[in-house]
Amino acid sequence: MEALSERFSALQDKLMDLYESGLEDLETQIQHWKLLRQEQILLYYARKRGIMRLGYQPVPPLATSEIKAKDAIAIGILLESLQKSKYADEPWTLVETSLETIRSPPVDCFKKGPKTVEVYFDGDPENVMPYTVWSYIYYQTDEDTWEKVEGHVDYTGAYFYEGQLKNYYIKFEADAKRFGTTGMWEVHVNKDTVFTPVTSSTPPVGDASNNAVPEASTTSLSSPQRSPSTNRRYGRKASSPTATTRRQKRQGKETLTRRRKTRSRSRSREQRGGRETQRSSSRGASKSPRRGGRSGGGPLTRSRSRSRSPESVTGGGVAPSEVGASLRSVSRHSSGRLAQLLDAAKDPPVILLRGGANTLKCYRYRFRKKHAGKFYYVSTTWSWIGGHSTDRVGRARMLIAFHSNHEREKCIQEMKLPLGVDWSYGQFDDL
């Protein structure tokens, strides 16, 4: 007990000396997180021995010490990786390497030069939300190297370029739906740079067309410039209520006319189909009518039976019970190209992990050591992008491939995923 208290007191003294030194080099920050990790290890050990207090320090629960120790290990790994980069000689403070700064958006990146951006929802200065954005962002690449880029702000949100990809770490649209009513907002940087919507047809929140965000100019946070639209609240004059009403009436009439024509053609086809069915049944013909329509009089046509078949391709992907079925049986019926592709997707087992990019990288490092020889391949981190832009969609991904389903299930039982990482099953025809 006394020896444990003395060791804990010695750690506290080292931490106090480090805080008082005020050194701003990377080696000091790495040492700081090593001391914090050792502190949590001592607290964890003391709690497990039933010790509730070390000196004047209450001993926290085991789960608290465990989480803080893991955080210290993760930050230490990031700092040691950064120390091998060309940015190791830059000044680094305790705030810039703190857990709160690293876990703030963009997550698991080092950041410098915080600035406050104010967003006025509905153009109302009273309905304002402040956001913290960054002048410089240090992100880790898939090759475990570090790159330094400038942070930017536009009408959509705050972002930085990760290679050629435009990576938004803050988007104002989500909060506009929560705190606004019109779906529009103004972005104020340094009290004088303003970004406002430049179209008069910006749809309100909840409209199906609200996915298209109005184009706006962009500024770099390291050297903000005044937006040319600061003299006006909105980039263009909004359409007058009279013109809008006329346009809506005209569009409504056109839509109504199209619906009537479509309904008339559909009714005509149904009537023809019904007459053919009656003539066919009265003659005792065995041949089904050419057009069954919606009359329901004749036997099922080929198209109808296909659309209602339980094996329809449109029914979705592969059921869990069918996984690996293509290797065990031969198909008894021919199918379309999409069905063949779905049948082919039942082979080598994989696990798909989803989480923060750097969190997955740190986990991959530990996974390869702990599970060596128990898996086939593990991929680098990657992301999906949309069909019409290079913006990343969702969280980062990582794949782990196995030789067999048994090997995969055994790994799932043994692996411990970091907080914020989830997984799902997957199959590939080939690797």
From Swiss-Prot:
InterPro entries: E2/EBNA1_C_sf, Nucleotide-bd_a/b_plait_sf, Papillomavirus_E2_C, PPV_E2_N, Reg_prot_E2, Regulatory_protein_E2_N, Regulatory_protein_E2_N_1, Regulatory_protein_E2_N_2. Residues 267-278 have a biased composition (Basic and acidic residues). Phosphorylated. Residues 347-431 are annotated as: DNA-binding domain. It comes from the Viruses. Residues 195-330 are annotated as: Disordered. Gene3D superfamilies: 3.30.70.330, E2 (early) protein, N terminal domain, subdomain 1, Papillomavirus E2 early protein domain. Pfam families: PPV_E2_C, PPV_E2_N. Residues 195-205 have a biased composition (Low complexity). Plays a role in the initiation of viral DNA replication. A dimer of E2 interacts with a dimer of E1 in order to improve specificity of E1 DNA binding activity. Once the complex recognizes and binds DNA at specific sites, the E2 dimer is removed from DNA. E2 also regulates viral transcription through binding to the E2RE response element (5'-ACCNNNNNNGGT-3') present in multiple copies in the regulatory regions of the viral genome. Activates or represses transcription depending on E2RE's position with regards to proximal promoter elements including the TATA-box. Binds DNA as homodimer. Interacts with protein E1; this interaction greatly increases E1 DNA-binding activity. Interacts with protein L1; this interaction enhances E2-dependent replication and transcription activation. Interacts with protein L2; this interaction inhibits E2 transcriptional activity but not DNA replication function E2. Interacts with protein E7; this interaction inhibits E7 oncogenic activity. Interacts with host TAF1; this interaction modulates E2-dependent transcriptional regulation. Interacts with host BRD4; this interaction mediates E2 transcriptional activation function. Belongs to the papillomaviridae E2 protein family. This is Regulatory protein E2. It comes from Human papillomavirus 23. The gene is E2.
